[in-house]
UniProtKB/Swiss-Prot annotation:
Belongs to the arrestin family. This is HECT-type ubiquitin ligase-interacting protein apyA. Transmembrane segments: none annotated. It comes from Emericella nidulans (strain FGSC A4 / ATCC 38163 / CBS 112.46 / NRRL 194 / M139) (Aspergillus nidulans). Pfam families: Arrestin_C, Arrestin_N.
Amino acid sequence: MALHRLKGHGANVGNRVGIQLDKDFVLFQGSEQEALAVYLSGILSLRLKETTTIKYIRLHLRGVRRVSSDTQSSLPARTGRKRFCSENEFYSRTWNFFDGYREAPMTVPAGEYKYPFDVVMEGSLPASVEGMKEASISYLFTVEIGRRHGRDITFDKPLRVIRVPDLEPCSHDFALDEVWANKIAYRIGIQNRTVALGTRIDVDYVFAPLLRDMKIAFIESQLLEVRDLSVEPNDGGSAHAARTETIVCSDRYTLGEEYSSKALESYQFSRTLQLPQALGHCVQDTEDMGVRVSHKLKIHVRMHNPDGHESELRLAIPVLIYLSPYYRVWEDSFCGETIPLPETLNPSDECPPAYGMHELDQLYMPQD
């Protein structure tokens, strides 16, 4: 599950410094109160083409939360927008492999050197939040190598932290089964209210008009993403809250001729909402450090009454979008760039089937 490209400063940094981790990402299972700590280890590799005098070798792991928001001034004398910004470091860990300030600078012959490191990341840490221009929660490894002669070397490698929520409470079928205004009975159901980013939401519809000659014009469904941000400025000013709502994906369905017959007592059909595969188009549900993202499925039903008037039925179903560790999300999508979606996916890129739609696992049978 790749993240943004590696970054560094100094001559031929990519050929000199590297960080190899024992896992591609940190995975927390459950809420911040339930998740167990995760052990992460790795190796910092340094390749020198010539003898070099080293002043220090350090490795940092930092977690940073950034939030920014624009607001329109409500005072007549003050026009224009004001930008609120907040940034704070909530996690920091440093490894000093060599410190020239405490020891004499070290002359290192040409060759390849490896420095192992490890860390235990507590399950209460917030998950990475990417894909939003106005907010982010990110983790970053930074290598600093000071040289007596020549430019110092720095190298960055991001670390993604994923939290998979408890899927059991929302993993069963959910349906709204009601009679609306004594005009129409309906049943709208989804198989699972917990959905992995990049998969789909299947919606089943059943409508039974209670009035003669009442017809359904169209059904529109939208996945709405709601972002609530709390900004505490770095300059100590007053806090600021902001909310934005975005339509992630939508579907509009007009009933065809097969449903126009008056003899039909009910309308039954199914529709699908395909979720984006890029974090720049959809963000997983989260509520950490003043960054809250939630989703709901909004359904709008337009109906023609026998007297010629129109009626509208509006419904909303809360859903939880999570980032699956088994599904590929597009790298660099956190920058808000438009990432073209592929026409086809390789089998290795596909998400595991939704709950209730999987096949029984087959036992391994060795061949004779």
